[in-house]
Structure formats: structure tokens, C-alpha cells
Amino acid sequence: MAALADDPNKVWTIDELKTRGEQVYNANCVACHQANGKGVPNAFAPLDGSQVVNGDKVHQIDVLLKGQDTPAYPGAMPAWKQLSDSDIAAVITYTRNTWSNKAAENIVQPAEILAARSK
């Protein structure tokens, strides 16, 4: 998605984020989490109905920036910190509004990713 030069202070609409997020998801996430968000049983975690995706967005941001190992899924989630702030915000927003997910905090802006990187 190349957009490391994106302005992290730009405020995106939810539709812009979801459109870009779908592209980011298809390029980087679909191999493990699948097009339907169901993951691969006993290998890669599902995102559809996930507590991480539907919970506190700060935790999901942290997972994308730092990766995560969980005993339930031996396929570890890698860190995606090489993606731009806009791409990470977009893919998180996409997952929080796709499949059966109805996250209360349903939008993430690039500035939130930028702030999380400095923690």
C-alpha cells in the first residue's frame, strides 16, 4: 500500500478507511485470517467475532504494531509496524466494521497509530 508518506494528521471518513482497509487486508492479512475473517482452525485466529477486534481499539493497535503469540493459535501474529499509519488505521477500521463485527469504537485514525508508535 506504499503510503508511508501519508499525512498521519489527515482525518479520514469511515468509508475511506474501510475502502483502503479492504485493500490492505487483501494484500497482507487474507492468507492467514482468510477472506471471510474466520482464520484457519488451530493455526490462525479468526477476526470475525474476535474479542480483540470488537474490544478496546488500543489493544488491537498494539497487536498490529507489536505482533502477538497466543497458545490457542500456533501461527503467531507478526508485527506490521512497517505499514504506514494510514494503512494500519484503515485495516483496523475495516476489520472492526466487517463480517459480524460491530465494534463500539469502530474507527481508527492514522494519528492514533502515530501516537501508539511513540509509546
Where are these regions (language model features)?
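Extracytoplasmic electron-transfer domains, predominantly the class I c-type cytochrome c fold
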Residues: P46-A104
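Intrinsically disordered, low-complexity segments enriched in polar/charged residues with Gly/Pro
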Residues: A3-L4, N9-K10, C32, D48, ...
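Flexible coil segments in periplasmic/lumen-exposed cytochrome c-class electron-transfer proteins
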Residues: M1-D15, P78-K81, D85-K119
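Sequence/structural segment immediately N-terminal to covalent heme-attachment motifs in c-type
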Residues: I14-V40, V53-K66
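Alpha-helix boundary/capping residues
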Residues: V24, N28, G67, T95-T98, ...
